[in-house]
UniProtKB/Swiss-Prot annotation:
PANTHER family: PEPTIDYL-TRNA HYDROLASE (PTHR17224:SF1). Keywords: Cytoplasm, Hydrolase, RNA-binding, tRNA-binding. HAMAP family: Pept_tRNA_hydro_bact. This is Peptidyl-tRNA hydrolase. Its EC number is 3.1.1.29. It is found in: Cytoplasm. Its main location: cytoplasm. The record marks 8 as: Discriminates between blocked and unblocked aminoacyl-tRNA. It comes from Thermotoga petrophila (strain ATCC BAA-488 / DSM 13995 / JCM 10881 / RKU-1). The gene is pth. InterPro entries: Pept_tRNA_hydro (IPR001328), Pept_tRNA_hydro_CS (IPR018171), Pept_tRNA_hydro_sf (IPR036416). The record marks 86 as: Stabilizes the basic form of H active site to accept a proton. PROSITE patterns: PEPT_TRNA_HYDROL_1 (PS01195), PEPT_TRNA_HYDROL_2 (PS01196).
Length: 186
């Protein structure tokens, strides 16, 4: 399995809502990242399986540029990938696991679907909440989480780790049935 967390590279974006994919991978493994031309990567053991963690080093909207290189490097197919990314249409504390689907208006996922030529890509969408009324969407997703939001997000990351283990052991459908209805609260 290759878990691809979406985000923007560099310290300016490190802790923004849009970088929730990168943040989750850092939650799983914060050290020992290696860098290739288009992506950073590491490996972990999860539920007894070797799992590759990948952060595309292109900017979010160009995430797909890294994917052919990722597939070749890990000798993987689109079926081996799970993409993790932010979703403003989901409340903070919620996740949605899907086996396939459209980009849902997310430009990073759109780029990946275009690059791989398929919508048959597993994904975990991470709720980052509704933007405040009157706030620009870009400003919201490129804003940082509050201290209270971090408490929820860390609990969400624990749940996401469990969900990945279920995907590995029992399959995506089982994980969907367990985790898509959960809401993490403080």
């Amino acid at each position: 399995m290759v878990v691809v967390g979406l985000g923007n590279p560099g310290p300016r974006y490190a802790f923004t809502r849009h970088n929730v994919g990168f943040l989750f991978l850092d939650f799983l493994k914060s050290k020992d990242w290696k860098t290739e031309k288009y992506f950073a990567w590491s490996r972990i053991k999860l539920a007894g399986n070797d799992v590759a963690l990948v952060k595309p080093l292109t900017y979010m909207n160009l995430s797909g540029l890294a994917m052919p290189h990722v597939l070749k490097f890990f000798n993987a197919s689109p079926d081996d990938i799970i993409v993790v990314y932010d979703d403003v249409s989901l409340k903070l504390g919620r996740i949605r696991i899907r086996k396939k689907g459209s980009d849902g208006g997310h430009n990073g996922m759109k780029s990946i679907i275009q690059a791989l030529g398929t919508q048959e890509i597993k994904r975990i969408r991470v709720g980052i909440g509704d933007k405040p009324e009157g706030m620009d969407l870009v400003d919201f997703v490129l804003g940082e989480f509050s201290d209270e939001e971090w408490i929820i997000l860390n609990k969400v990351f624990e749940v996401m780790k469990e969900a990945l283990e279920v995907i590995l052991i029992e399959g995506t459908e089982k994980a969907m049935s367990i985790y898509n209805s959960l809401e993490v609260r403080v």
